[in-house]
From Swiss-Prot:
This is Allograft inflammatory factor 1. Its main location: cytoplasm. The keyword Secreted does not apply. Phosphorylated on serine residues. It is a peripheral membrane protein. The modification Phosphoserine is found at S39. Ca(2+) 1 binds at D58, N60, N62, D64. It comes from Macaca mulatta (Rhesus macaque). One of its GO terms (molecular function) is calcium ion binding. GO terms for cellular component: actin filament; cytoplasm; cytosol; glial cell projection; lamellipodium; nucleus; perinuclear region of cytoplasm; phagocytic cup. Residues 128-147 are annotated as: Disordered.
Amino acid sequence: MSQTRDLQGGKAFGLLKAQQEERLDEINKQFLDDPKYSSDEDLLSKLEGFKEKYMEFDLNGNGDIDIMSLKRMLEKLGVPKTHLELKKLIGEVSSGSGETFSYPDFLRMMLGKRSAILKMILMYEEKAREKEKPTGPPAKKAISELP
């Protein structure tokens, strides 16, 4: 058995998350200074919330969310997607490779006016949602509406 075993895995993970948080704070500062997003209400709290969510699903701390992390994120949000849908979503959001997307891509997606990924999620949600049947007595019909 090795004598040089590192028993501080939690400490190393904490340092990794602290470094990641510093990097994301720098990116948040860039978005706060960007005039494109200056009209957004409560931008600081939105960015903080997005940072927390991003850190929750960027488990390896490399700064990118891959397809499996996105799948887990959407499942946790109650919007599970197929592998093909996820690939399309990442392709639309990603500014670089088609396999992952970065934190700035994530912020542009979330802060954009009805972004592509949000539109796709809403579209799939509408398709999945069944029309509710009206309850109560049927509405009265006029003679002209009868067959």
